[in-house]
Protein backbone atom coordinates (compact mmCIF):
# COMPACT_ATOMS: atom_id res chain seq x y z
CA UNK A 1 0.00 0.00 0.00
CA UNK A 2 1.21 3.49 -0.87
CA UNK A 3 -0.04 6.62 0.91
CA UNK A 4 0.74 10.23 -0.01
CA UNK A 5 0.39 13.26 2.25
CA UNK A 6 1.12 16.95 1.89
CA UNK A 7 1.76 19.53 4.58
CA UNK A 8 2.10 23.29 4.84
CA UNK A 9 3.11 25.56 7.67
CA UNK A 10 3.99 29.21 8.20
CA UNK A 11 5.34 31.12 11.18
CA UNK A 12 6.04 34.78 11.79
CA UNK A 13 9.60 35.97 12.38
CA UNK A 14 10.11 37.71 15.74
CA UNK A 15 12.94 39.04 17.87
CA UNK A 16 14.00 37.17 21.01
CA UNK A 17 13.37 33.73 19.49
CA UNK A 18 15.82 31.07 18.28
CA UNK A 19 15.54 30.20 14.60
CA UNK A 20 15.17 26.43 14.24
CA UNK A 21 14.36 25.01 10.81
CA UNK A 22 14.52 21.33 9.97
CA UNK A 23 15.84 20.59 13.44
CA UNK A 24 18.87 22.84 12.86
CA UNK A 25 19.61 26.05 14.78
CA UNK A 26 20.32 28.83 12.30
CA UNK A 27 22.10 32.00 13.41
CA UNK A 28 19.84 34.97 12.68
CA UNK A 29 18.59 38.08 14.44
CA UNK A 30 15.04 36.70 14.57
CA UNK A 31 13.40 33.36 15.19
CA UNK A 32 10.01 31.90 14.42
CA UNK A 33 7.09 32.70 16.70
CA UNK A 34 4.83 29.88 17.81
CA UNK A 35 3.49 27.81 20.69
CA UNK A 36 6.26 25.23 20.24
CA UNK A 37 9.76 25.95 18.91
CA UNK A 38 7.92 26.86 15.65
CA UNK A 39 10.09 24.71 13.38
CA UNK A 40 8.17 25.46 10.19
CA UNK A 41 9.80 22.66 8.19
CA UNK A 42 9.29 19.89 10.75
CA UNK A 43 5.70 21.05 11.23
CA UNK A 44 4.99 20.77 7.50
CA UNK A 45 6.61 17.32 7.41
CA UNK A 46 4.68 16.15 10.48
CA UNK A 47 1.44 17.40 8.94
CA UNK A 48 2.21 15.60 5.66
CA UNK A 49 2.84 12.34 7.50
CA UNK A 50 -0.36 12.68 9.52
CA UNK A 51 -2.24 13.37 6.29
CA UNK A 52 -0.73 10.32 4.59
CA UNK A 53 -2.11 8.03 7.29
CA UNK A 54 -5.47 9.81 7.23
CA UNK A 55 -5.30 10.92 10.86
CA UNK A 56 -6.20 14.60 10.62
CA UNK A 57 -3.57 17.25 11.15
CA UNK A 58 -0.81 18.34 13.51
CA UNK A 59 -3.20 20.49 15.55
CA UNK A 60 -5.27 17.41 16.40
CA UNK A 61 -2.27 15.71 18.03
CA UNK A 62 -0.48 18.78 19.41
CA UNK A 63 -3.01 21.61 19.96
CA UNK A 64 -1.58 25.07 20.57
CA UNK A 65 -4.07 25.42 23.41
CA UNK A 66 -2.34 22.65 25.38
CA UNK A 67 0.44 23.95 27.65
CA UNK A 68 2.10 20.53 27.48
CA UNK A 69 3.37 21.57 24.04
CA UNK A 70 4.51 25.09 25.03
CA UNK A 71 8.05 25.53 23.64
CA UNK A 72 8.03 21.84 22.59
CA UNK A 73 10.88 20.51 20.47
CA UNK A 74 9.31 19.85 17.06
CA UNK A 75 11.76 16.99 16.47
CA UNK A 76 10.22 15.20 19.46
CA UNK A 77 6.72 15.80 18.10
CA UNK A 78 7.75 14.36 14.72
CA UNK A 79 9.33 11.36 16.43
CA UNK A 80 6.11 10.71 18.36
CA UNK A 81 4.08 10.67 15.14
CA UNK A 82 6.70 8.58 13.34
CA UNK A 83 6.52 5.91 16.06
CA UNK A 84 2.78 5.59 15.36
CA UNK A 85 3.44 5.36 11.62
CA UNK A 86 6.06 2.63 12.05
CA UNK A 87 3.81 0.75 14.48
CA UNK A 88 1.18 0.72 11.72
CA UNK A 89 3.73 -0.94 9.41
CA UNK A 90 4.63 2.04 7.23
CA UNK A 91 8.07 3.20 6.19
CA UNK A 92 9.24 6.23 4.28
CA UNK A 93 9.24 5.94 0.51
CA UNK A 94 10.42 9.50 0.03
CA UNK A 95 9.96 13.04 1.26
CA UNK A 96 10.25 16.28 -0.69
CA UNK A 97 10.11 19.58 1.19
CA UNK A 98 10.50 23.25 0.33
CA UNK A 99 11.37 26.13 2.64
CA UNK A 100 10.16 29.55 1.45
CA UNK A 101 12.20 32.38 2.99
CA UNK A 102 13.76 35.61 1.78
CA UNK A 103 16.12 35.81 4.76
CA UNK A 104 18.10 34.17 6.12
CA UNK A 105 19.37 32.13 3.22
CA UNK A 106 18.66 28.47 3.93
CA UNK A 107 20.91 26.85 1.30
CA UNK A 108 23.94 26.57 3.62
CA UNK A 109 21.87 24.49 6.07
CA UNK A 110 19.87 22.27 3.72
CA UNK A 111 22.25 19.30 3.86
CA UNK A 112 22.27 19.32 7.68
CA UNK A 113 18.46 19.49 7.67
CA UNK A 114 18.25 16.58 5.25
CA UNK A 115 20.48 14.42 7.44
CA UNK A 116 18.58 15.33 10.62
CA UNK A 117 15.20 14.59 9.04
CA UNK A 118 16.43 11.25 7.68
CA UNK A 119 17.64 10.38 11.18
CA UNK A 120 14.26 11.27 12.72
CA UNK A 121 12.42 9.14 10.14
CA UNK A 122 14.83 6.17 10.35
CA UNK A 123 15.50 6.60 6.65
CA UNK A 124 18.40 6.92 4.27
CA UNK A 125 19.24 10.52 3.40
CA UNK A 126 18.64 9.65 -0.28
CA UNK A 127 14.93 9.34 0.59
CA UNK A 128 14.78 12.93 1.85
CA UNK A 129 14.98 16.07 -0.27
CA UNK A 130 14.97 19.59 1.16
CA UNK A 131 15.19 22.69 -0.96
CA UNK A 132 14.89 26.41 -0.34
CA UNK A 133 13.47 29.20 -2.43
CA UNK A 134 12.28 32.79 -2.15
CA UNK A 135 9.21 34.58 -3.44
CA UNK A 136 11.33 37.21 -5.21
CA UNK A 137 10.52 39.73 -2.45
CA UNK A 138 6.74 39.27 -2.91
CA UNK A 139 4.27 38.61 -0.09
CA UNK A 140 4.93 38.13 3.62
CA UNK A 141 7.98 35.92 3.07
CA UNK A 142 9.38 38.43 0.58
CA UNK A 143 8.93 41.20 3.14
CA UNK A 144 10.85 39.03 5.64
CA UNK A 145 7.83 38.82 7.96
CA UNK A 146 7.84 35.03 8.16
CA UNK A 147 8.91 31.69 6.74
CA UNK A 148 6.72 29.06 5.07
CA UNK A 149 7.30 25.42 4.26
CA UNK A 150 5.68 22.75 2.10
CA UNK A 151 6.18 18.99 2.33
CA UNK A 152 5.03 15.95 0.37
CA UNK A 153 5.60 12.48 1.75
CA UNK A 154 5.12 9.01 0.29
CA UNK A 155 4.71 6.16 2.76
CA UNK A 156 4.91 2.47 1.87
CA UNK A 157 3.51 -0.56 3.65
Curated annotation (Swiss-Prot):
It is an enzyme of class 4 (lyase). A divalent metal cation binds at residues 9, 11, 43. One of its GO terms (biological process) is isopentenyl diphosphate biosynthetic process, methylerythritol 4-phosphate pathway. One of its GO terms (molecular function) is metal ion binding. Its cofactor is a divalent metal cation. Binds 1 divalent metal cation per subunit. It comes from the Bacteria. Pfam families: YgbB. The record marks 35, 134 as: Transition state stabilizer. Pathway: Isoprenoid biosynthesis; isopentenyl diphosphate biosynthesis via DXP pathway; isopentenyl diphosphate from 1-deoxy-D-xylulose 5-phosphate: step 4/6. Keywords: Isoprene biosynthesis, Lyase, Metal-binding. InterPro entries: MECDP_synthase, MECDP_synthase_CS, MECDP_synthase_sf. Homotrimer. Involved in the biosynthesis of isopentenyl diphosphate (IPP) and dimethylallyl diphosphate (DMAPP), two major building blocks of isoprenoid compounds. Catalyzes the conversion of 4-diphosphocytidyl-2-C-methyl-D-erythritol 2-phosphate (CDP-ME2P) to 2-C-methyl-D-erythritol 2,4-cyclodiphosphate (ME-CPP) with a corresponding release of cytidine 5-monophosphate (CMP). This is 2-C-methyl-D-erythritol 2,4-cyclodiphosphate synthase.
